[in-house]
Amino acid sequence: MIFSKHLLSHFVDISHLDIEQMCMRLSSMGLEVESAYPLKMPQKVVVGKILSLTPHPDADKLNVCKVSIGSQELQIVCGANNVKANQYVAVALEGAVIPHTKSGEIVIKQTNLRGIESCGMLCSSVELGLPKINDGIMVLDSTAGHLELGVELGNLPLFNDYVIEVGITPNRGDCLSVLGIARELATSYDLRLKHEVDMDNVVTLGLGRVLQILCDEKIEAHLLYRVVEVKQAYLPLDIALCLARNGSLVDDIMCNFLEYGTYMTGVILNAYKLYDCENKDIVLDNGLVAQLRIKKDENGLGAVFAHQKLSIIGVSYGERHFGTRSEIYIIEASYVNPTLIAKSLYKHAIKGDVQLTYRSTRGSNPNLEQGIDFLCRKMVLVSDALVYSGSHNIVQNIDEITIKTTFKAINQIIGIELDKEEIATILKRLNFKLDATCDENFFMVTVPNYRHDIQSIQDVAEEVLRIYGIDNVSSVPLLCSQSHNINNTYFTYKNTRKLAYGLIAYGFVECIHYVFASSQNLERLGFVRLDEDLELLNPITNELDTLRTSLLPAMLDSVKRNENLGFKNITLFEIGSVYSSKREEKSKLALVASGCMQDECYPHTKAVKWNLFAFGTICQRCVGDLSFRNIRDEANAKELLSHFCFTDERLLHPYQSAFVYQKDKPIGIIAKLHPQVATNMDLSEEIFICEIEIGMSDFSLPQAYEFSKYQKSTRDLTILIDKDIPFYRVRQILLEDQIAYVKNIYPIDVYYDKALGEKMALSIRIVLQSDEGTLQEMQLVQAVESVLSVLVREFDAVLRT
């Protein structure tokens, strides 16, 4: 956004303000000043008047001009095609340094051009360091100031100016106009905006006598129409320079007036030729009535129609070629909610006018009278124009944005304590309306209709801070404290991932399946289903009609798919949620191993197949300290199976299945897949499965214990014992008896024979170690005898020799 101090003076008096301080204030308010520089006209460039001109006798494109500069008359040869008598022009006198010519910097000297003496130069805007406004010389008019012959050009108000460029963020569409910048300065410095004076040249003929406007349906747009008759179109110098500086100057004078009105006020302006909107079917006393019809177009956007579509409101101006002849114009001011336009452009991919949609999607000025009155007043002042009395207004209700807040909340957001009166004063200067509520702690803030970016209490607090000055807020260290976010959920997640990483290290592949399952498949494999009243009401497919009660069915299906694809050795695991028959969610770990642990590869000339002990060892290493108890040895086997959602043991091998225990708590099941199930599912027979409840697993941190530095000793015993006694009971009894020096006991071998009857030969190894010294043979013998006596006492064991 580029503007000047001269343009700001149309709306607010800033003559007493220091430009540098004003730029700093704008930047602190969020309108970052990108550049600010004074206009500097070359010395010895003065105001002159062309008294007469005659063609050059020896050049077709040159004219000999007699120019008055007040104190004298000069003869100047000029080649500009727009030079005319009685024009006020910028005259560079002898000795003037002109920096911006095609040849670079030149010094004006008296010279002879094809035999004619020339004592100066008539300057164009570009040669004076100004933006280009035409292809000829720059013609001065009253908008530059009082034109006194011989006065230095730099002393005229239009050229004794500062040019400022600010960066406008996308949310500040209200500042895409000089009026918007003036409002910001008026608020910051507590100044009053200037009131507009009434227009002259308003004819008694009313707008309704020449224009009829029909609105077919409710459109989401606000429109205001006036009629202006332009008898002689002329674009003043100040408008030309202003638009050229912003890169929006075009050849059409009326288009330039419309762009200038929008640039100055932020109101979107358009125009139509009255005669182009003529309706031959309607004739009144004056013999002419133009008709505009406002309705929605094929994309649902408000559009203006006559005999054809003229424009899309807020999106496209339509074709604008007005010319310079005497004409009656219909002036249109419009406003559409920026969100509505942005959504419509995105939805319909409409190609609109870039500059128009740039403004309308960021939020134009909804106060249409400001824009249309400013434009009409400017046209009356600088052109031979008449404004018809009256206007036609199409108004839609605009929902005011109201925000409920407190002074305390605003102070907390800003970070300092401001008085209530100071906050209220700042908001009122910003044209916010404040209303008290029944609760004295709260008040309602009504946002001005041109501030589309204010939506929340944070926005209100930001406005207060902008005007108060962010530099006035002292910097303090940021106080932040991190709350203790480590909870059971975090530990569960970390432990499950640690478990997964361990299994991956052992070659297992993690897989994920649907939480839904087939109820028929669950029943076929011997798993419980959800209670009937808790089943899914609207399953996604017939095959996934219930919630899974086990991870194993889907895991076995994955094994089958992989075997069908040619994979022989398959190791999978999954960590996921399952549900009990009461729809209680649990987290479980399931493992499946199929095929061989290791293929044939030297030095293993034969493949190493999976077995229950190897499979259980990996489970133990990854999950933790586990023990396995034969299902047949458990008195409450049915209850435990039911707890783990099994209806029976049909999935499990009758002789290779066990409950998984951790610290004497049952947490899952490990087994070889029943051969009949493997056959029915067309699977290989060597498949091992395990399912563990993660919620029941112990993931406590490892405990460090003092260990002995003395050597260990081992002794082996072979005893005859009842074959129905599981080894875990033998080990449990021996360790609970706390026999001196006994550190561990584990089985070596077991032997069954008909000759032994109901007995079996169990070989165990006893690990012995002392914390105080190396054990002597006598101590070892005593320890072994103590072990044997416990076995005899508890299990009627007989030492086998």
From Swiss-Prot:
Residues 39-154 form the tRNA-binding domain. Residues 708-800 form the FDX-ACB domain. Mg(2+) binds at D453, D459, E462, E463. Binds 2 magnesium ions per tetramer. SMART domains: B5, FDX-ACB. Residues 398-475 form the B5 domain. It comes from the Bacteria. It is found in: Cytoplasm. Its EC number is 6.1.1.20. GO terms for cellular component: phenylalanine-tRNA ligase complex. PANTHER family: PHENYLALANINE--TRNA LIGASE BETA SUBUNIT (PTHR10947:SF0), PHENYLALANYL-TRNA SYNTHETASE BETA CHAIN AND LEUCINE-RICH REPEAT-CONTAINING PROTEIN 47 (PTHR10947). This is Phenylalanine--tRNA ligase beta subunit. It comes from Helicobacter hepaticus (strain ATCC 51449 / 3B1).
